[in-house]
Amino acid sequence: MAKKGNRVQVILECTEHKTSGQPGTSRYITTKNKKNTPDRIELKKFNPILKKMTVHKEIK
């Protein structure tokens, strides 16, 4: 029987958007390798509501 893959889907949510007071959220879905990166990831992604690059952290 084949093993399951190490890749899982994770959701990234903007950290700066909560403090801005504007409605809505900026979220991205990506995949990560559990064995190579066991901790939560942080990536700089574009937030279309704030119209700038912001730090997005893994949630859940």
From Swiss-Prot:
One record GO biological process: translation
Top-level taxon of origin: Bacteria
Family recorded in the similarity comment: Belongs to the bacterial ribosomal protein bL33 family.
Single GO molecular function: structural constituent of ribosome
SUPFAM superfamilies from the UniProt entry: Zn-binding ribosomal proteins (SSF57829)
One of the Pfam families matching this protein, by short name: Ribosomal_L33
Protein name: Large ribosomal subunit protein bL33
HAMAP family linked to this entry: Ribosomal_bL33 (MF_00294)
GO cellular component: cytoplasm; ribonucleoprotein complex; ribosome
Keyword Ribonucleoprotein: yes
Statement: the UniProt record of this protein carries the keyword Nucleus: no
Keywords: Ribonucleoprotein, Ribosomal protein
